[in-house]
Amino acid sequence: MTSSIECQNFLRSLQLLNLLIKIGVQNLILCPGSRSAPLAIAAGELNKLGMVNIFNSIDERSAGFHSLGISAASGNLSLVITTSGTAVSNLLPAAVEADRSCKGVIFLTADRPLRLKDCGANQTVNQEDFLSSVCRSVLSTNLNGLHETQENEILNLVRITEKQISTFPGPIHLNIPIDKPLDISFLNKKNVLEVFKRIYLKKQYVFQKVEIKSDKNKFLEISKIFNLDESGIILVGPYQGSVNDLSSFNKSLEQLQEITGWPVFADPVSGVYSDLRGLVVNWELVLRKHKNLIKCKQLLRLGPMSSSIDLENFLIKFEGIQILIKEKNYRKLDPIKKSFEYDFGLLNFTSILLEELSFNEKNKKSLTPLALDLIEEGKQIKDILKDEIIIDNKITEYKLANLVPKLWPAEHPIMLSASSPIRDWLTFSENGTLTRNCFSFRGASGIDGTLSLALGISRIKNPLLLVTGDLAFVHDINGWLIENSVDMNLTILLIDNNGGNIFNRIYKKNLKEDEFKKLFLMPKEINWSKLSESYQVKFKSVSNFKKLREAFDWSISIQKSVIIKVDIDPENEIYEKNALLEKIIGS
């Protein structure tokens, strides 16, 4: 009986992982543990066969975010394997972000069998409930143990997973009860592998392709209020679709712009291509300067709202029609509750629209007068920024946002951490992110997992530049414990402002300095050079933009993980930036 259970545990683990690979899993993050041993051993064998990449991580929290970074950069499913108990609870932060940013991640967790539940057995908790509030589905094999699970049950579980991910991308929790014995002898492993290779490895499985059918009535309802002959603006927020669909998204956007002639406001992580006609540079500053003068009757919003108070205020006060198009995101996505929401994506919307119009070259429109005016306003602000932001000046966060896209090679990807960087880049980067893939995890917009996310992205797209503040970086310092993380082609631009600089903009004026530091800034005296050395990561500190350019060239050439630190004086930052903004608004 012992031999039977251990063989069945191993065989079913092989079958489950093999099927998950067939629906798109290419990369697997493995966390330590005993209860998950059959899954780990099976993963190791499939790795030997060249079927899946395995990277280990001793911290489940980092593993979850690392897997999410891989999914975002590749457009493919990624997988995390953990043991039971508190290990599962550590996956929640990454599951929350995967849910809100609509990225496919599978959390495969080992559990105790039913006979050990609710009786005080060690390391036995209600882990099947831990991720349920944010996962598309929580599925399980036979509750008595994986060894009692039938082949068709595993196939059905994977089919449900594939259907859920295809319909509404996001996290899936597969909770797998496994009974002892967890190990398997060399002889039994050899015999089971022979059976698996002979019967299951090359077996063909049918996974029903999910076709997402649009609601033509919903389109017609929206098209009645969508007037191509009236002036409007296209607002493109953070891109939530798959990176594999980015080309078709941009083609649809190009077609939409051609038949409207409307101006386009693009978020730094919108995925919009830099050569799109109608792009308005410095659009947030244009909004701030002319908030009451921009007149049009309709707005076409793509994806979630950008992190801009100026944009939010503009949308709240806007009295015309707002249409919001979402990419496979079926939840409400409009916090100001003023838009007509369309769930089926820009490609679908544009295809039906062009079909209704019988589109041809004659339908193309010149840029509208509003577009020409906004583009000119953006260029005037660009001239001011060019005069004011001089490369030899002292480094500040807003200057980094403006100059780093020019210093980092235009074809190389960038990741922006949450908090200050994404906001500064939205205001000052002048569409500099649109020449490349630019990532920022704006689903839940937390600073969690910053380093692990970047390491995940850099496995797929590199050399990658991560722009992060000191607190966001050190919050996820365990990311360096992910396998071969120091060998990734990742450059970290560490903005050291000795605490949460974003709070200087919000709470400082109403608190005493010591209160402000303790309650919000939370500064940490960290020796960054020694910290880097302890993880065997190369480190440089630079004090001006000339040295920063040289440091970028150095970091790309060595093809390893590198930290480049710049020090920021928050007081000087606030004073300089406010003076610059006053000059722009008053021009």
Swiss-Prot record:
Pfam name, any one: TPP_enzyme_C
Molecular functions per Gene Ontology: 2-succinyl-5-enolpyruvyl-6-hydroxy-3-cyclohexene-1-carboxylic-acid synthase activity; magnesium ion binding; manganese ion binding; thiamine pyrophosphate binding
Cofactors demanded by this protein: Mg(2+); Mn(2+); thiamine diphosphate
Keyword Nuclease set for record: no
InterPro entries: MenaQ_synth_MenD, THDP-binding, Thiamin_PyroP_enz_TPP-bd_dom, TPP_enzyme_TPP-bd
GO annotation, biological process: menaquinone biosynthetic process; phylloquinone biosynthetic process
Pathway participation: Quinol/quinone metabolism; 1,4-dihydroxy-2-naphthoate biosynthesis; 1,4-dihydroxy-2-naphthoate from chorismate: step 2/7; Cofactor biosynthesis; phylloquinone biosynthesis
Cysteine disulfide partners in this protein: none
Superkingdom, taxonomy of origin: Bacteria
Catalytic activity of the protein: isochorismate + 2-oxoglutarate + H(+) = 5-enolpyruvoyl-6-hydroxy-2-succinyl-cyclohex-3-ene-1-carboxylate + CO2
EC number annotated for this UniProt entry: 2.2.1.9
Cofactor mode of binding and number, as noted: Binds 1 thiamine pyrophosphate per subunit.
Keywords: Magnesium, Manganese, Metal-binding, Thiamine pyrophosphate, Transferase
SUPFAM superfamilies in the record: Thiamin diphosphate-binding fold (THDP-binding) (SSF52518)
Role summary: Catalyzes the thiamine diphosphate-dependent decarboxylation of 2-oxoglutarate and the subsequent addition of the resulting succinic semialdehyde-thiamine pyrophosphate anion to isochorismate to yield 2-succinyl-5-enolpyruvyl-6-hydroxy-3-cyclohexene-1-carboxylate (SEPHCHC).
Quaternary structure, from the entry: Homodimer.
Family: Belongs to the TPP enzyme family. MenD subfamily.
Entry protein name: 2-succinyl-5-enolpyruvyl-6-hydroxy-3-cyclohexene-1-carboxylate synthase
Native source species: Prochlorococcus marinus (strain MIT 9301)
